[in-house]
């Protein structure tokens, strides 16, 4: 007679099924039709009922896991459908709307203005009520080069305030590049289905209506952040304290984030499970001690139970104050499960507790499964649990404080080694890099941050003078990290690995830290090698690969031959704190395994073409730069060997020919506008050819036709000036005769790029037009069919793609 499975095993398989079903749903390019989801939900419910009523045998466990997966798939699909139903109507994009709502969370200021989330209460368009999404991501900027903005955001903009705002909105749309940050996923996860900016004008001002009592946690967070910023003079230290006290990671400047990533301590600069656990432990200890002082309280509830529940409540409060991030959520759910199990007299194995916490997190936020923080957080705890020595081994505390201190030191070193080695494969998977000084940096940073800096940051909320001491500790830590970051080979970079290498690397990381026989652990390094140094297949000699990156309104193209890399333009500068180099090109180059740039060609000086060049030059070795930049330009002072871009120079790399066709040397003395000085580059391989044109305009197109009309024919044309009416003359298109035309322009470009009449010229000639706002990054492989990133990697939360001419 078969026996019922143990409850812990049943819950374990239920959790595995739930997580598997959720993961499968997140891979769908489009949501299933409602009838199909309804049928799947009914099947899942029937299977769950059968497995629960007849809980005997291994088959019932499999049925239970399948049922849980089916129900998770349906539940996630239903929530996704509700969010997609909140989408902004296309007819309202770019229109002047009047929206009333409440500031939903603490605003975040930058040099360019303030960003905030508005919980909407009503909207009108041309005096008529219209529907808008419940949450809007908005910018209120300081100054602009058109009449869209008046003044800037008010100093008193705070969470909980009700405003009536003139807005221009658009649907969520972000850059779409291989291995890039998925902005549309992040907005979808937050429930934000439109974004835009405040367009205050004298005749339609922004009006503050009231201060509400809502959003008390966000108001408290904002007050705490403002107090820290006023109390601490050093911006770097103030940003770290704000991140550790209230979870405001945006307060940390980009330079400090780069330093923390290089040295492997970035995980400490957000409120993590370690911080929440220590806070809960301290709160439980204090509550238990105080509880024992009152006999009536002891009669009502035992002190250990009161301490556990009190610690849980305090942990939840701290996690809310921290912004309820995934690591904090995971810890709160784990503590809650342990408290419930202890209260009921049950003891589950730690893997079951960990999986139950993962189910709780994904039940509230299924899209957390796609975030690096989810996997780093849960895998870190799982590795520490899996690598624990036997309980008997740990239970024997040696006599004497020195021996106990030595044991604690060894345990700390071992824990750090487990985290560093075990998480290295995941770091390579998500970031294509791992810090080589992370072990040493964390030996100092973990005790300093968790035992001193983070507690003092919190204590400063009650006693602000403590922040001055805490700031000094942060400054010392940053100085030490900078010294570590100055050593050679501070970080190991590698290309994004194929799935088989990822699987081998993750298995190797587990074997490296698990308490297994050495015969098995010896396989750890060989298994991790394909992930740490994955095979990269360059184009064969005589051929090249082209990637037109999706960088919004601007230009950035990668050209890779067998042994060389050319970057043509570096995209725009998005703000005074962000550019295409940092946000798009560096992650893309890192994922492709590009260690250096052989030639950086900047077509002309416009900011949408050179905005990311500085970041590129500072982060990667750049062998040479060619441009039409004027003498004295800031980029020429960065130490890269430079030659002036002018017609004539031609060279060959690995059997692929390159030739500069424009401008002429004589053009440099004529004070032409920047567009007229665009570097035009022709690239020819054995199988394909490309013509890169920058912002070339019609007069220069005509001059180029006279000089080289017979040799302009190319398979691919980078559409001049993003499809502006100033360019793409009919005669020029007839000479080039492209099969594909690539337009790099922003979504709903404020300049109207690409112009419909220009696109009609291409359509009349049978040219296939690829638009980056619809296609994402476009790749022309050396061998195979060209493809759009939005087509091959589409998920249901993404903005619709497409390559057709409008």
What are these regions (language model features)?
Residues 213-231, 240, 248, 256, ...:
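Hydrophobic alpha-helical segments of integral membrane proteins
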Residues 13, 21, 196, 248, ...:
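Hydrophobic alpha-helical transmembrane segments in multi-pass membrane proteins
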Residues 1, 5, 764-765:
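Helicase C-terminal subdomain and adjacent C-terminal extension
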Residues 2-4, 60-267, 578-590, 596, ...:
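Membrane-interface helix/helix-cap signal primarily in integral membrane proteins
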